[in-house]
Regions:
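Periplasmic/cell-envelope proteins involved in peptidoglycan metabolism and beta-lactam response
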Residues: 1-48, 52-56, 70-71, 127-134, ...
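Structural recognition of the beta-strand scaffold that forms the well-ordered cores
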Residues: 17-18, 27-29, 71-74, 107, ...
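Mid-domain, small-residue-enriched loop/turn segments at the edges of structured enzyme/sensor domains
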Residues: 87-94, 125-163
C-alpha cells in the first residue's frame, strides 16, 4: 500500500475493438485512456478517414466486376478532372512518390499503390463502388461517389472497419456487431436476449465466398512481403 507510481496523461489516445466475425459479438473494446476522464468512445464515436485500409473494399468490388489478382494495371501518373472528385484538379501520388508502371492487381495491393486503386475505381465506376461497399455495412453518406473513395477519403469508425473486415474473415457474410448477449434479473431469468446474425444460419451472404477468399489471400501477402511486414513479429500465420 506504500507503493507509488507515476501516471502520465496521454496527449494522444487510441482505441481497440475485437469482433467475432461469425456472429458479430464484441469480445473486447477500449474506447480511450480513461472513461472517467473522458466519456468519448473512440470505437463507436470517432469518425476518421480510413486511408489505405479501405483499399481492400475497392479491390473486392473490382473482383466482382471481372478483375483478377493477375490483372495488369498501370501504376502511372494521373490527372483527375475536378468534377470527378467534387473539388479541385487532382494529381494523386503514391506514398513514396514513385511509380511502378504495369503490375498485377495482387502486386499493387501488396505495395499499396494509390494510382492502381484509383484506376480500378475508374474502371468499375464510383456509383457501383458506393453501392458495393454497402454490403460491408458502410453508408453512402459517409462515402461520396468520388474517385477519392479509392484512397479511403470517406469517414468510418473503428467498429465500422471491424464490421467491414468481418465479411472477408467469415467468407462473405455480413454480421451486425452487438454488445449485450442477454439481460437477466437477480433470479437468473432472461429478460432480453440478442438474436445475432450467425454465419451459415441467418447471416446474409453479401459477397461471393470466392471473392472473400481471394481478398484474404491477397491481404496475407501484404504481411508476407508488403507494407505490413512488421506484423510478422507476432509469429502468426493467420494474419491478413
Amino acid at each position: 500500500k506504500d507503493d507509488w507510481e507515476i501516471s502520465q496523461m496521454p496527449q494522444v489516445e487510441g482505441a481497440f475493438v475485437s469482433v467475432d466475425p461469425h456472429n458479430g459479438a464484441i469480445k473486447s473494446l477500449v474506447g480511450g485512456f480513461d472513461f472517467n476522464r473522458n466519456h468519448f468512445n473512440r470505437v463507436t464515436m470517432a469518425w476518421r478517414q480510413p486511408g489505405s485500409s479501405f483499399k481492400p473494399f475497392i479491390y473486392s468490388a473490382g473482383l466482382e466486376r471481372g478483375f483478377t489478382p493477375s490483372s495488369m494495371i498501370n501504376d502511372a501518373p494521373l490527372v483527375i478532372d475536378p468534377q470527378s472528385i467534387g473539388g479541385q484538379r487532382w494529381e494523386p501520388k503514391n506514398y513514396d512518390g514513385k511509380f511502378g508502371g504495369m503490375m498485377t492487381m495482387r502486386q499493387a495491393l501488396t505495395r499499396s499503390k494509390n494510382l492502381v486503386s484509383i484506376r480500378i475505381l475508374m474502371a468499375i465506376g464510383t456509383d457501383y463502388a458506393q453501392e458495393y461497399i454497402g454490403r460491408f455495412g458502410f453508408g453512402a453518406k459517409q462515402h461520396p461517389a468520388y474517385l477519392t473513395m479509392a484512397l479511403g477519403a470517406g469517414m468510418v469508425t473503428p467498429l465500422g472497419m471491424a464490421e467491414g473486415y468481418s465479411v472477408f474473415a467469415n467468407g462473405g457474410s455480413h454480421v451486425t456487431p452487438y454488445f449485450i448477449d442477454r439481460i437477466e434479473d437477480d433470479r437468473g431469468q432472461v429478460l432480453a436476449q440478442t438474436a445475432p446474425q450467425v454465419v451459415g444460419q441467418n447471416a446474409k451472404q453479401t459477397i461471393d465466398p470466392r471473392n472473400a477468399f481471394i481478398m484474404t489471400q491477397m491481404m496475407k501477402e501484404v504481411i508476407d512481403r508488403g507494407t505490413a511486414t512488421l506484423a510478422k513479429k507476432l509469429g502468426r500465420k493467420d494474419l491478413a
